[in-house]
């Protein structure tokens, strides 16, 4: 049974939106049940006593998203703030991650798609040796490679979202879409930056920002390597013990 009031003492490091959001959904251990069975979720309002935040972090990318540590020092919340019972908490959290992966993949796709659109226009306007860059076969091949990767990622995301229309996306499809989109976004944005030469490396033209953000999406929401482990687990039909 859950006590009338829940007390939290812990640290959540590198939390997006920390100090900016009006409230926080916090998953924490709430019972002595073994392993993940004791994990539930509560809602903690910004004004709760004992809730404080660390310094705002300066990240390589994601400059528009505040990020900081969250500290819970004897934070008490009423039972009405209980969102997920301990018995179901971890399972529901994992299901939510399946949905988050699709959103993450979409953001990675947006970075790559915007980079491709920008550099496609650039290579038609920029000239070398008396003709546009796009007239060189090496540039044409890179454009084609970038387009194929962008469209493949788009289809994987659409597949995961379409098959989830009656529920949440499945872990195999959402992890596949996220993993491919994350890797693709890094490849496409860095290729676009390279095609632009020094202009791509210049903050004035925005391409270097897309590169920085593209690398961030491959870390947020479960790293690329974690997605590959999820994919392998779904293929085999069981989770692997990575600890023993």
Predicted regions mapped to residue ranges:
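Single conserved hydrophobic/aromatic residue that forms the stacking wall/gate
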Residues: 1-11
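DPxDG-like acidic metal-binding loop motif
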Residues: 12-48
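Flexible, small-/acidic-enriched active-site or ligand-binding loops
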Residues: 47-78
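Alpha-helical interface subdomain recognition
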Residues: 71, 88, 95-244
């Amino acid at each position: 049974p859950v006590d009338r009031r829940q007390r939290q003492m812990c640290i959540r490091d590198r939390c997006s939106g920390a100090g900016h959001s009006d409230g926080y959904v916090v998953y924490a251990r709430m019972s002595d049940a073994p392993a993940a069975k004791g994990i539930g979720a509560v809602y903690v309002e910004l004004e709760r006593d004992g809730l404080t935040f660390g310094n705002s972090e300066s990240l390589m990318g994601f400059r528009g998203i505040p990020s900081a540590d969250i500290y819970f020092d004897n934070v008490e919340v009423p039972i009405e703030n209980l969102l997920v019972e301990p018995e179901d908490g971890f399972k529901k959290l994992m299901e939510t991650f399946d949905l988050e992966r699709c959103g993450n993949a979409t953001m990675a796709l947006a970075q790559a798609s915007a980079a491709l659109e920008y550099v496609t226009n650039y290579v038609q306007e920029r000239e070398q040796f008396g003709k546009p860059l796009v007239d060189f076969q090496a540039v044409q091949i890179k454009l084609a490679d970038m387009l194929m990767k962008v469209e493949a990622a788009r289809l994987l995301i659409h597949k995961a979202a379409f098959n989830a229309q009656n529920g949440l996306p499945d872990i195999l499809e959402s992890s596949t879409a996220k993993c491919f989109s994350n890797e693709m976004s890094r490849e496409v944005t860095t290729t676009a930056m390279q095609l632009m030469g020094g202009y791509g490396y210049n903050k004035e033209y925005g391409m270097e920002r897309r590169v920085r953000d593209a690398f961030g999406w491959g870390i947020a929401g479960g790293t690329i390597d974690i997605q590959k482990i999820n994919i392998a687990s779904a293929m085999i039909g069981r989770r692997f013990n990575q600890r023993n």
